[in-house]
From Swiss-Prot:
InterPro entries, alphabetized: PSI_Ycf3_assembly, TPR-like_helical_dom_sf, TPR_rpt
SMART domains reported for this sequence: TPR
The TPR repeat ranges on this chain: 31-64, 68-101, 131-164
GO cellular component, as recorded: chloroplast thylakoid membrane
Organism, as annotated: Thalassiosira pseudonana
Protein name: Photosystem I assembly protein Ycf3
Length: 184
């Protein structure tokens, strides 16, 4: 049995015990069952099934904290499928419900960073007769803005989890966007 499979089984056993021991309404238990089914499907790579279960969980779950993790997991699926606008939408929703989600903040930053790199790539592509200097400048400005957004979200993630995301910390230092990283 692999480590991941063992962890999944332990999670299932512990979550079943918690549901039995803690008072929860039928609706809360059903929402959690959908969440667990979504996690299982996501682990298996069945993203359509995972999304279906996560959406059911969102419909039933009223707890903001629980909903934030469901939204985060939905964002993970969209990011995995390279639908970055949708991933950002769900990560932002997750953070709006739970501001203590450094992993969501990190993922938001990573998407903005990736988009910034793509904008720079567009700016540096070989000139074709159609592209004007003003367009190249626009791509560079777009990249700068996206990198600034990435920096802000990485800064927030590192503030919550100072020992995580060493590559982000290094990028912030190298690009001069570190603010006061050493204070945490």
């Amino acid at each position: 049995m692999g480590v991941r499979n063992f962890i999944d089984r332990v999670f299932t056993v512990i979550s079943d015990l918690i549901l039995k021991l803690l008072p929860a309404s039928k609706q809360e238990k059903q929402a959690f069952a959908y969440y667990k089914a979504g996690m299982a499907a996501q682990a298996e790579g069945d993203y359509a099934e995972a999304l279906e279960n996560y959406y059911e969980s969102l419909y039933l779950d009223e707890d903001q904290y629980d909903r934030s993790y469901t939204l985060y997991n939905i964002g993970l699926i969209y990011a995995k499928n390279e639908n970055y606008p949708r991933a950002l939408e769900y990560y932002h929703q997750a953070v709006s419900l739970n501001s203590n989600l450094p992993q969501a903040l990190n993922n938001i930053a990573a998407i903005y960073h990736r988009q910034g790199l793509l904008a720079l790539e567009m700016a540096s592509q070989d000139y074709d007769a159609e592209m004007e200097i003003s367009e190249e400048y626009e791509y560079i400005e777009l990249a700068k803005g996206l990198f600034d957004k990435a920096a802000e979200y990485w800064y927030q993630a590192l503030k919550l989890a100072p020992d995580n995301y060493p590559r982000a910390r290094n990028w912030l230092r190298i690009t001069g966007r570190a603010k006061s990283l050493d204070s945490f």
